[in-house]
């Protein structure tokens, strides 16, 4: 009897294992059968969910880009169909002195607004991230210019730049200095626009830096204090390197904004005097809707798109892999 019980137990175990194996094989076979019997719409359903967004993206992004590139190879005639001219519009663009002037203006505008607004945003974020009295009010004051429409910002700054009656000339008058036409002088108009855009954009970029600073573990600063590191050394060696991904994101947004902001030109200067304040996008607007030269405007648009694509490639293809920390 002592040897019979283990034998019976073993046979029962082997029998149960065989049953489990058969059940598993039957279950797998059932899954394969159900997978083969799965209706076609189950595979198509995810694509149907993506279809509305894909249609909108193709209609309002991809098609306009292709249509713009296509239009650059033609010229329109008043009483006839469009005439194919090949690369003539591109040759005319490179021979156009106004194009080179507005491109230079845009470069000066970008170099003036991008680094200054980023540096100011970083300083403001570090300041409002500390424990100080009225911190909420200070944050609101820094961010308020961002929520104002560009048209409103332009009108506010016209109050500063108006000759003789503006705030700047009123302050100059206190020192016996004559009035100055800030927006009518080729040497000062671009600087005036740069200051205004920095005032508007710095608060927007500050939000990203503030969010990044609040995500940094406080143990880093405590460890640096224990080691005797000063605030400047801690910022240069720890804080700023950890903020580089945020700086890259803010930088690419600043580059895009430097080429797409033209609302203030319509209100303040209309590109003058003598195209001294005209930017590339505003020149495209003038060519398309004032001079009614749509093919040449399309050619300028392709050039603007190419500049932004190069900036994006530098960002995603080169800088991303060198400054992100895992």
Predicted regions and their residues:
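Transmembrane alpha-helical segments of polytopic membrane transport and secretion proteins
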Residues: 1-13, 19-50, 132-135, 314-326
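A structural signal for multi-pass alpha-helical bundles of membrane permease subunits
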Residues: 42-326
